[in-house]
């Protein structure tokens, strides 16, 4: 997200970044210190778990990027802490786009985990492929709740977009790696470094997929 903010400001776009706590300077300061932030960036409070909280931030915008998602592989209640909030979050943002009446396009960051997690692997994947949600729930491989949440959320997003004739694009990246601007390490890099740190749970994720550098995304 922080890289997206920087990349959007570079050609001159006015950017509204949403965070759960604008008063948390440890997390917000790196954004405010980016080149051009004083004139091109504003920080808005919004939370995927609070219905309608994105309405004001999106009002007046012409483009919206949805890049965040609840992620906790050690959740004791993944259904209510990850899966349902992910679905509700994307739909709430799409509703806010409709209310704004100014948004021309929504770009939604989905995941390669929405199409290639199946019992029978295929030699080729395309836009007609979906991960097998029931297979994920049954096997419960590392990160299964993430695969389920992103798959169901994207399916609901496409239904909503078709019903309301919204211009939506989904991006399907695998594990995203690269330098980071925030003071805490992103979850994707914790996974990427697992061969060094010895984190077996995260290492099992590496064996399931591929990488993409953020500059290529």
Swiss-Prot record:
Function: Bifunctional enzyme involved in flavonoid metabolism.
GO molecular function: dihydrokaempferol 4-reductase activity; flavanone 4-reductase activity
Biological-process GO terms, alphabetical: anthocyanin-containing compound biosynthetic process
CDD domains tied to this protein: FR_SDR_e
Organism name: Medicago sativa
Protein name, as recorded: Dihydroflavonol 4-reductase
Pathway recorded for this protein: Pigment biosynthesis; anthocyanin biosynthesis
Family, similarity comment: Belongs to the NAD(P)-dependent epimerase/dehydratase family. Dihydroflavonol-4-reductase subfamily.
